[in-house]
Swiss-Prot record:
CDD domains: ETF_alpha (cd01715). Its main location: mitochondrion. Residues 1-19 form a transit peptide. Heterodimer composed of ETFA and ETFB. Identified in a complex that contains ETFA, ETFB and ETFRF1. Interaction with ETFRF1 promotes dissociation of the bound FAD and loss of electron transfer activity. Interacts with TASOR. Residues 205-333 are annotated as: Domain II. InterPro entries: DHS-like_NAD/FAD-binding_dom (IPR029035), ETF_a/b_N (IPR014730), ETF_a/FixB (IPR001308), ETF_alpha_N (IPR033947), ETF_asu_C (IPR014731), ETF_asu_C_CS (IPR018206), Rossmann-like_a/b/a_fold (IPR014729). The keyword Phosphoprotein applies. One of its GO terms (biological process) is fatty acid beta-oxidation using acyl-CoA dehydrogenase. The lineage of its organism: Eukaryota, Metazoa, Chordata, Craniata, Vertebrata. It comes from Bos taurus. The modification N6-succinyllysine is found at K59, K69, K85, K158, K187, K203, K216, K226, K232, K301. This is Electron transfer flavoprotein subunit alpha, mitochondrial.
Length: 333
């Protein structure tokens, strides 16, 4: 049975939306914006009201300019200081609190990446509110949806905090359009460096393959590959597909690959156009990290493997025969 809202209720709802304002904490590498920030902006737009982005860094003018062009962003706040090098949460927290004091946002959010998960709990603690982590949908300005029990159950959370602080699962929201916007840009509130931690260095592994969480195609291997050397089969296949390579926790724990390739509840969450699971049985923890993929292909010699329950296409066969055959066929195209 449906019940029509009274005119007064509609006016109050419209008024509430009008006064919503969301601050998105931008994740970036000074010259490039992290893709998850665009997904977070889309989530923020679902709340209604004005969306502002805070960019903190050392030489982040380009990122600020790029954000001004993003559809749906009304304002970009820029803070540049040597203290913000490396985006240390200890230094960013006072900046965000000062920004919140100035603009009185109703919502503060960031992507549910290592950056966001490290920063937002500090913000929430300082504001004395309970944060909401890893949301996958927004029902209203105070009602959010997230998964629990390794993705096997969905929880709807109603938040009555004065400021809603939450992190966004990037794979659950489309990326905001990188063009079409015309946001204004201004300097953010200045704060003194805290100085309790210092950014020293960062060493990035260079790879011709796309980054795992942003790749359109992912080829992942599990314990069925039997050794780290056999992961070369996946690397060869991935090269033909221009894909990223991932792994199950079992493969990581066995020492086959490093943990930066781990896909799953305790690893990285991915949702590519195509996910190929090779020699992966399909533990709940792994499924939680890839079940939102658009198309899932599973290769496993065990027909009872749980991975086939979520796969769109399944190949029950020896991976050591199938994967090289797939690679050779792709080479001939």
């Amino acid at each position: 049975m449906f019940r029509a809202a009274a005119p007064g209720q509609l006016r109050r709802a419209t008024s509430l939306l009008r006064f919503q304002s969301t601050l998105v904490i931008a994740e970036h590498a000074n010259d490039t914006l992290a893709p998850i920030t665009l997904n977070t902006i889309t989530a923020a737009k679902h709340l209604g009201g004005e969306v502002s982005c805070l960019v903190a860094g050392t030489k982040c003018d380009k990122v600020a300019q790029d954000l001004c062009k993003v559809a749906g962003v009304a304002k970009v706040l820029v803070a540049q200081h040597d203290a913000y090098k490396g985006l240390l949460p200890e230094e960013l927290t006072p900046l965000i609190l000062a920004t919140q004091k100035q603009f009185n946002h109703t919502h503060i959010c960031a992507g549910a990446s290592a950056f966001g998960k490290n920063l937002l709990p500090r913000i929430a603690a300082k504001l004395d509110v309970a944060p909401i982590s890893d949301i996958i949908a927004i029902k209203s300005p105070d009602t959010f949806v997230r998964t629990i029990y390794a993705g096997n159950a969905i929880c709807t959370v109603k938040c009555d905090e004065k400021v809603k602080v939450f992190s966004v699962r990037g794979t659950s929201f489309e990326a905001a359009a990188a063009s079409g916007g015309s946001a204004s840009s201004e300097k953010a509130s200045s704060t003194s460096p805290v100085g309790i931690s210092e950014w020293l260095d960062q060493k990035l592994t260079k790879s011709d393959r796309p980054e795992l969480t942003g790749a359109k195609v992912v080829v992942s291997g599990g314990r069925g590959l039997k050794s780290g050397e056999n992961f070369k089969l996946l690397y060869d296949l991935a090269d033909q597909l221009h894909a990223a390579v991932g792994a199950s926790r079992a493969a990581v724990d066995a020492g086959f690959v490093t943990n930066d390739l781990q896909v799953g509840q305790t690893g990285k969450i991915v949702a590519p156009e195509l996910y190929i699971a090779v020699g992966i049985s399909g533990a709940i923890q792994h499924l939680a990290g890839m079940k939102d993929s658009k198309t899932i292909v599973a290769i496993n010699k065990d027909p009872e493997a749980p991975i086939f329950q979520v796969a769109d296409y399944g190949i029950v066969a020896d991976l050591f025969k199938v994967v090289p055959e797939m690679t050779e066929l792709l080479k001939k195209k």
